[in-house]
Amino acid sequence: AKKINELLEKNYDAQKGFVNSSEHVDNTNLKTYFKSKAAEREKFADELKREIISFGEKPIDSGSITGDMHRTWMNIKSALSSNDEEAILEEVQRGEEASLEDYNEILEETSLPESTKAMITRQRNAIKNSVNNAKRYEHIVS
């Protein structure tokens, strides 16, 4: 459950990252995309929370304890301050690619119950699609 809690924490961070990103872009397509990704990550967090509780463990209730975002979402702060849509999109993509690695790492563990593995796989696949979809937005901002 500890690793799933870490995944939960990273989903909170990603959700905050997407919300912040949506507030710093003018392009309506990008704004909508970031908002939908934030909502998706909130849903993922709820699913992970329920899973942790089902193990009899206590889920964390917010993002990174220190208040600093996870390493992959840190660089987004500087991109946001520049209001550079291309830089923001790049950092979001980098964050999603790092999330993909985190999910793959957890899926390599054989000790996960099948139901947990199925949920994490579904979330991972959605993030993988997100990485591919984000590429569609590159032409909008470049």
Segments predicted by a language model, with ranges:
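Soluble, non-transmembrane catalytic domains of enzymes that act on hydrophobic metabolites at membranes
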Residues: 4, 26-29, 47, 118-126
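Preference for long, well-ordered alpha-helical segments
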Residues: 88, 92-142
